[in-house]
């Protein structure tokens, strides 16, 4: 019996109050068409599980139909910069949305435990896939966490780019799938590997953002950015396995610079699962699905966490909304828990990954007293006993975590101890640090060869400003 239905009929299968597990990853293969159809059907009061998929939560929050969500990261990086989902943030502030932000690996392990007990974490898994057949078999080029979401749910409702007669080796077999609808471009404006890329204008319309036109950076600003990237690259060791997480376009570029200069034998695993991806320009985000087509191999997100847990990852880059002198990182909120001034994107997988790796590299492009603080407002991740080395790279110095806290190993040219102290919110010991070695001609030439168009400078720009968002009541049509 055929399981193929219309998109509208598929959406009607999701009743108000349902718990939904949403597939895709960041701005890749999100079931956008299905989400819009659900919203247009005036169903609401949903509970959502996402690992992590902030644009999906943004659509549901903007429509006022999301009651609670489990999502470890509600930000994403794209052509306009880094954005924290604004409707999600607003719904949390007004009390309309109860958001829980566990470590992504905790979510994965919870899904596994529920699956292994034969139970379900969600009523439905909502997916968009590359291929389906009429019996319900699904094929996904880039599964991410989708297989696990399907296995831990009551059933799968899927949209597909194409229907074929038969899929002999399905990613998700028909017995897990309830219904399928044809929806070409059904993941747009997010990407669908093998079919189309991300549409920045469409993303912008969904979140209410616009590109802010800024003057070109001055020579001193471009020099500072190049030096920051070079100093990051110098922390990457040869013959190591190194990983980047979400919103890590800057570290990804630094890793490629290291590969072409001082660390030719490194193994780099991107968070989308691309092993040794070919980096031939400055990408606007580290979550680039197309990298999976230009790499040595792939690994899915649950297996990447397992690899780190089992000691297979040496080094990882981390960001920090705040970091204190003892190495505690805050990615959660600024201000008290009861009334935060700013809600940050969330932990992603940083707590678990930090507890498994030997070398922790922390990138803070602009050192200020408000981000290098005496005490973090929330402890998202902390130093672990397995961390043999923790290095913090800023635009002022290169810091090393010692037994008594961070100490500057070197200060950049033109930075005095007084300058450094004025930009640091914690006390530190300063034992006559060296001056950071200037960039070499080889490093500069190699960086320019990777990114001749200067896309790297856009990675350091401010966030987009709000404009009118795409109205959730607008009819969005999909070919199907």
What positions do the PLM features span?
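Conserved alpha/beta enzyme-core scaffold
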Residues: 1-423, 428-432, 437-480
């Amino acid at each position: 019996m055929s399981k193929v239905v219309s998109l509208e009929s598929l959406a009607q299968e999701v009743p108000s109050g349902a718990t939904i597990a949403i597939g895709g990853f960041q701005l890749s293969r999100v079931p956008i068409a299905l989400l819009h159809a659900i919203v247009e059907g005036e169903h609401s009061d949903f509970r959502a599980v996402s690992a992590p998929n902030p644009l999906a939560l943004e659509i549901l929050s903007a429509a006022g139909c999301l009651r609670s969500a489990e999502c470890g990261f509600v930000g994403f990086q794209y052509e306009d910069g880094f954005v924290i989902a604004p409707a999600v943030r607003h719904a949390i502030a007004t009390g309309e949305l109860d958001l829980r932000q566990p470590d992504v690996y905790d979510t994965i392990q919870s899904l596994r435990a529920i699956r292994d007990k034969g139970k379900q974490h969600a009523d439905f898994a909502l997916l968009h896939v590359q291929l389906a057949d009429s019996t319900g078999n699904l094929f996904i080029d880039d599964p991410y966490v989708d297989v696990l979401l399907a296995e831990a749910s009551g059933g799968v409702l899927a949209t597909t780019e194409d229907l074929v007669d038969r899929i002999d080796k399905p990613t998700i077999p028909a017995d897990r799938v309830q219904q399928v609808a044809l929806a070409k471009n059904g993941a747009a404006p997010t990407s669908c590997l093998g079919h189309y890329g991300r549409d920045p204008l469409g993303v912008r319309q969904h979140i209410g953002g616009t590109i802010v036109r800024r003057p070109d950076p001055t020579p001193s600003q471009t020099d500072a950015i190049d030096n920051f990237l070079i100093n990051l690259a110098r922390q990457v060791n040869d013959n190591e396995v190194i990983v980047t997480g979400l919103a890590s376009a800057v570290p990804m570029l630094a890793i490629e610079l290291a590969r072409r200069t001082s660390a030719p034998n490194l193994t780099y695993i991107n968070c989308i699962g691309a092993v040794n991806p070919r980096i031939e320009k400055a990408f606007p985000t580290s979550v680039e699905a197309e990298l999976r087509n230009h790499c040595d191999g792939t690994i899915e997100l649950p297996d990447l966490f397992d690899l780190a847990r089992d000691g297979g990852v040496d080094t990882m880059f981390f960001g920090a909304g705040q970091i204190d002198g003892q190495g505690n990182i805050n990615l959660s909120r600024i201000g008290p828990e009861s009334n935060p001034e700013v809600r940050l994107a969330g932990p992603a997988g940083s707590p678990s990954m930090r507890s498994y790796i030997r070398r922790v590299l922390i990138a803070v492009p602009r050192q200020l007293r408000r981000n290098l603080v005496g005490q973090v407002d929330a402890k998202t991740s902390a130093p672990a006993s397995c961390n043999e080395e923790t290095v913090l790279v800023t635009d002022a110095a290169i810091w090393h975590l010692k037994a008594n806290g961070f100490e500057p190993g070197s200060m950049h040219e033109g930075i005095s101890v007084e300058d450094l102290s004025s930009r640091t919110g914690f006390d530190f010991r300063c034992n006559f640090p060296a001056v950071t070695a200037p960039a070499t001609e080889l490093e500069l030439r190699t960086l320019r060869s990777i990114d001749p168009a200067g896309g790297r400078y856009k990675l350091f720009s401010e966030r987009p400003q709000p404009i009118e968002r795409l109205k959730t009541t607008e009819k969005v049509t999909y070919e199907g």
